[in-house]
Amino acid sequence: MRVNIVGAGLAGVEVAYKLLREGFKVRIFEQKPVKFSPVHKMETFGELVCSNSLKSESLKNAEGILKEEMKLLDSLVLNCAYKTRVPAGKALAVDREKFSQCITKVLESFENIEIVRKEVEKIDLDTNEIWVVATGPTTDGKFAQWLSKLTGGFLNFFDAVAPIISRDSIDFNKCFVGDRYGVGTGDYINCPMTKEEYERFYRELVNAEMIEMKDFDRKLLFERCQPIEEIAKSGEKSLLFGPLRPVGLVNPHTGEIPYAVIQLRKEDEEGNMYNIVGFQTRLKWSEQKRIIRLIPGLENAEILRYGVMHRNTYIDTPRVLDEFLRHKKYKNIFFAGQITGVEGYLESAACGIYVGLNISRILSGKEPVKLPPKTMMGALINYITKADELKPMYANFGLINVKMKKNEKREKLHEICINEMKNFLNMLK
């Protein structure tokens, strides 16, 4: 039997990869390049539309634990991430074009794959074939209308993207290279600000013109991608404890810690492009250029991609889907990725791995399985399928119910999670 996957984002490609390696036939429907969402630019699969960072690799962080679990499950997304990584201190960041090309090339190499470049408008509910909806948070058009009827409506939140600038336009006489606390290999460019420079930047930022968005509601902003202007409006010093915090950074030109620092992170392997860390925004493009050029060292910044805001859509998973992310009524329709309420690149990919695993089992005549609740992946799936009031959720320690003090949890939880996942995989053999 052939499996149909709608969407070749991070979740869709993981579902496909698992099934293709098991020898099953897969047909992927990808609307690009026939149609692009407001935030997608490339024709290739697994496009990263926000940051190019896949977060920390430290096992003292939930994101690091999630990566280790995904490695055990042979994640395509992680395999390509490690092949296309760029320096980013303790974080795993990638050259987004090479990363997307890597994923596409791997999937295209399978003989049992069919790639259909078209926009899907609906799924035939009378079909016996398995379908996976992995259309992501920017699902729209006729398919969104059909999906809304199938699921009883959508939930929403707003997300934003940071600008990217050219390295050649940075004045290194005013900036310095370095990582916080001297840890790392000098992966960030730092633009230091005096108190006067910060206050001017702050005044102009909070008074800058923004793009109006239909049905925009500040209460629906996702906490990890708050626009910088929204953070600023919460208080004059709010940025100093957020994306502009200077802690751990000493300006070699003065020997002192600056009043504020704006950091730039590599966007590509060659280091020709840098994104402005924490500068997600919905300012008008003309205002973005004006505000960015107030930053010391960026007075002549060439902006290669402007920041944008977009509405993210997801379904009410606990009400609509079962514990295996199948539709409760139409058991041949699965959902994967951010459309289910997970938030984050790797969280979406992990969701796809889980769905791919269970579809493979079903096609092999076996029963689907739940992931252990004391794994990061299992806890995440457990949350989105059982939450009383579903809110977008990323990997975090609070998802796993173990009786430990906070510091002890940070030190030891990775051992519990990884052992649980290893035992689970051994059980499946």
From Swiss-Prot:
Catalytic activity, EC: 2.1.1.74
Record GO cellular component, one term: cytosol
Chief location category: cytoplasm
Subcellular localization, as worded in the UniProt entry: Cytoplasm
A biological-process GO annotation: tRNA wobble uridine modification
Residues reported in the UniProt entry to bind FAD: G7, A8, G9, L10, A11, G12
Reaction equation(s) it catalyzes: uridine(54) in tRNA + (6R)-5,10-methylene-5,6,7,8-tetrahydrofolate + NADH + H(+) = 5-methyluridine(54) in tRNA + (6S)-5,6,7,8-tetrahydrofolate + NAD(+); uridine(54) in tRNA + (6R)-5,10-methylene-5,6,7,8-tetrahydrofolate + NADPH + H(+) = 5-methyluridine(54) in tRNA + (6S)-5,6,7,8-tetrahydrofolate + NADP(+)
Chain segments annotated as transmembrane: none
InterPro entries to which the protein is assigned, alphabetical: FAD/NAD-bd_sf (IPR036188), MnmG-rel (IPR002218), MnmG_N (IPR040131), TrmFO (IPR004417)
Protein purpose: Catalyzes the folate-dependent formation of 5-methyl-uridine at position 54 (M-5-U54) in all tRNAs.
Family, similarity comment: Belongs to the MnmG family. TrmFO subfamily.
PANTHER family: GLUCOSE INHIBITED DIVISION PROTEIN A, METHYLENETETRAHYDROFOLATE--TRNA-(URACIL-5-)-METHYLTRANSFERASE TRMFO
Protein name per the record: Methylenetetrahydrofolate--tRNA-(uracil-5-)-methyltransferase TrmFO
Species, as recorded: Thermosipho africanus (strain TCF52B)
